[in-house]
Structures are given as C-alpha cells and as structure tokens.
Amino acid sequence: MTDTPRILITPSPLSDISTTINKPNVHPSMSLLKALPECRLVVKSKGDKNNANVVEFPLDRHKQLLIAGKVYHDYKFKPRKSIFDRVTDPNYFAKSEFRGFYVLFWLSMAAWVLQLYARSYWQRDTLLGLPLARQVFRQFFVLFSSDFLMICLSFFSYGLQVCIEKNMIRWANLGYTIQTLWQGFYMVLAVYWVKHRDFPIVQCVFFTLHCAVLIMKQFSYSHHMGYISEIRILHNEYEKLLKFVRECLNSTEKDEKYTFELTFPNKPAETISTLQAEEIVALTAKYLSRQMRSEVGNVVYPDNINFFNYVDYLLVPSLVYSMEFPRVAHFRWHYMAFKAGSTFGLLALTLALVDWYFVPSAVAVKDLDFIGKLRIAPLLMNKIMFPAIILYLIMFYLIFDCILNAFAEITKFADRGFYGAWWNTVTWDEFSREWNKPVHVFLMRHVYHSSISGFKLKKSHAVLLTFLISALVHEFVMLLATGKFRCYILTFQLLQIPLYDLQQMFAFKKRDILGNVFFWIGMFTGPSFLCILYIVF
C-alpha cells in the first residue's frame, strides 16, 4: 500500500455523515479534495471463478466531479455595506474631512439639473424636449407588460429543476440539453420582440439588459442545481455502498465472501482491507453530502427547490445562485424612501443631460454627408466630453447604489458589495473587477473558472474568453439599441487587455498615481468618443 494515498480518518466520526456537519467549515478545501485517491474501487466475490466485479466505483472521476463543484463556492457572500452607504453613515460622515466635497458635488448636480430644466421651460415652454419626451414615454405599458411576461417565462427553469428533483429526468442526460435549448429560445424571443415592437433606444436598452439579467440568473440557477442533482444521485449510490461495506465489517461471513481492490491505470491492482475501503467510501460520501448543503450549512438540497426560493432569487441583486444568502434583520422604510427619492432625482438629471447635450448632437449630424460628419465630430466630442463622464458616473450610482440597494433592502439581502473603489483603479483589469461586481462574479464563476475546470483552458485563454464574451454581449446590446453593427464597443473592450500589458511597463510600474491618471484620461475620452462614433458613424 505504499503507492496508495493514505486516508487519515477513522470510521467512527463518519457514522452519521448525512447529518453531521461542521458549520465553520462546511465545504472541504481544494487540498482535501485533491488528497482523494486517483483510482477505481472494485468489489469482488471471492467464490466467483470468473473473478467478475460485483460493483465498481470510479473514484478518480468522482474526485474530478467534486473538484469541478468548487466553482460554485468561489465567491463567499457575507454581510457588508456598499461603499457609499459606509461613507454616508452618520457616525462616519460627521467625522469625515471630505464631507463638504460630497455635499458640494450633489448640490452642484442639483443646481445643474434645475438650470437645464429652467432653460428648457423658458426657451421651449416645456420641461423636457418633445422628441425625448415622446421617446421616453412611448410604449410605456407595452414595455412593462412585456418585461413581466419575460419574468414569468423564466419560471421554466424552475419547473425543469422540479422535474429533475422528482427524478422525472436527469440533468446529465436530458436536463442540460433542454435548459440550453430553452435559453437559446428565450434569447431569440427577446430579440424578436424588441425588433417587432420597434422599441425606442431607452426602452430597448432596458428590456434587453433585463432579459440578459434573467438569462444569466436562469443559467446560474439551473447549472448549480443541475450539478447538485447529479451529486445527490452519486451520493445515494455511495450511501448504499457504505451500508454494504459496514455490513461486511460487522459480519464475518460477508467479510470473508467479498474482497476490495483499488485499480490504477498504470500499475497493478492492490487489495485493501474492508476497514480501508470503509474509510475511502465514507470520506467520499461525506464530501458529496456537503456539496448538497449551502455555504453556511443551514439549507440542504432539495429543500431549496420551491417556488418562493426562486422568486426570492429573482429579486435578490445577485446574478449567481446561492442556496443561502446572508440577510439583514430588519427592513428600513427610511432607507428605502431615500433610495427611491435618489433614483427619481438621478433619472431627472439623466434626462436633462440627454435632452440638452446628446439629442442635439444627434440632430446636428443627421443630414450631413460623410465629410461634414468628419468635420463636426471633434466639436461634438468636445461638447459632450464632460456631460458624458458625468452621465457615466450618474448611471453608475443610479444602478449600483440606488436600484441594487433598493432591491437588497426589499429582500433583506445583506451582501451589498456591488462595486469596489474602481475610481482608484491603477490597471484596467482592476477596473473590470471592481466597477460591476455582480457581472464580474458571474463571469468569474460561469466563464473563467468553468472554462478552466471544464475545458482545461489556460488561465490566459480563459481571461481572453471572458473578455470576449463580455464584449460581444455589450456589442449585441448596442446593435439592438442603435441598429448599427460597428464593433466599436467590442474593440474598445478588447483593447483593455493590451492596455493592461502597457500599464505593466516600467513607466507605470509601482506608480499608482500615474496609472490612475492614465485610467481617468481613458474614462474622460472613452465614453464621449464611443458616443460620437455611434451618433456620427
């Protein structure tokens, strides 16, 4: 037994492996999983002249299945406030030396929006330009009824998991194929409906992005639960085997009747004792059992496969599924009112900026020829550069600090780290990780880590694949919104990879301020340049 990995565990602590869970460390570490034996466990009958196998368990394959499941525990949800909620907490804010700048910024935004609406009223006798007003409120009822229908259709993924849990179908055989075809149909339906209804750009972007969110939520839910359903089937088989092995331990007659072997691909098989077989089977069964529990350990599959759990997941501001999210104790009405008020105020500012800076720019180039557009493009870029970066910041705050925090408060979701301090970014890869945490976690789990574990890609290739998929989705949204297939945003996003390499050069290495200056130059010029490209060309 010198070449066989030693399983350092006694049988007694594993006697109740299905119910006993060590809460502080529910899921085994990668090092523990890698310590499992790379072989097959074979049970043979001593009296069989043909030396046929009674049962055979591919421990190596099951080990790889357990290791692949680590992808569903690559991000730990934990209670935390968003950055702006922390810095505006009364206890912190009153002591901050920068509180005056925070107040000044929002007063400046309020003064700006009042100025723009006042100018609109004096010059046009209306608070909002007629073309934009028509666009914003066009097909309003159709938009939200269509969105509600797409939400209802997403329950197909829940129904499929119910069928899998009831053993009507298996995820590995038919479930995966059905889910893939369904999500393809769901995406085609969303695109068809956008084009069929001819939604204006605002409605088109909202509907498309929300459908993309629903697709990602369904993908994460179905693949996570599908994986656990396969783990449950395998765990039940190991439970039966463990019962059989323990019967052999307790019965001299059975112990003398059966023999246990470990077979290896490149060396002779080795006979092991019944006690050693019990150790190996019990440990593997224990790890399989823990895969069916939530990260904290309080929820066990299939208890989470129910209607209300899925509804809760749709409302929770997370794109990846977890069997048990951290929660806050109380719902705060004053907090919800503040976020709702902030949302409407920021929407008013957004409409004013679009009305006075972006709509006139689009109108100015509408009837020009190509040469005329080239001549006016630099002037338009200069005009919208500052409004574009302000609009970018406002949209970031609106989505990630107001809307997501509002849904977090509704569901009492405690992990509100929806973004990091991306404004201090030194490299572009840091920006891609920090500015949109929900999407980053989804891509990290279901693209980056899954491509490494499932397709054996190198890390560099997995990074490229992740950036490519993200860029293609952004370009597809712009195609639907503008009707133009130009690959501008696709190119700019993929340029982040060589820009990261550029920032690793000596000129930027260990010069965080210089790197941050380089980042903000890109932020000032990038959004405005993209706007001009899509407006003019």
From Swiss-Prot:
Membrane topology annotation: Multi-pass membrane protein
Major enzyme class: transferase
Protein EC: 2.3.1.-
Gene name of this polypeptide: are1
Official protein name in the record: Probable sterol O-acyltransferase 1
Active site as annotated: 474
Residues passing through the membrane, by range: 98-118, 140-160, 174-194, 199-219, 344-364, 384-404, 462-482, 517-537
Gene Ontology MF: a single term: ergosterol O-acyltransferase activity
Chain positions of motif FYXDWWN motif: 418-424
Protein family (similarity comment): Belongs to the membrane-bound acyltransferase family. Sterol o-acyltransferase subfamily.
Pfam families given in the database record: MBOAT
Gene Ontology biological process: ergosterol metabolic process; lipid droplet formation
Glycan attachment sites: 250
Record localization: Endoplasmic reticulum membrane
Alphabetic keyword roster: Acyltransferase, Endoplasmic reticulum, Glycoprotein, Membrane, Transferase, Transmembrane, Transmembrane helix
Function in brief: Sterol O-acyltransferase that catalyzes the formation of stery esters.
Cellular component, GO annotation: cortical endoplasmic reticulum; endoplasmic reticulum; endoplasmic reticulum membrane; perinuclear endoplasmic reticulum
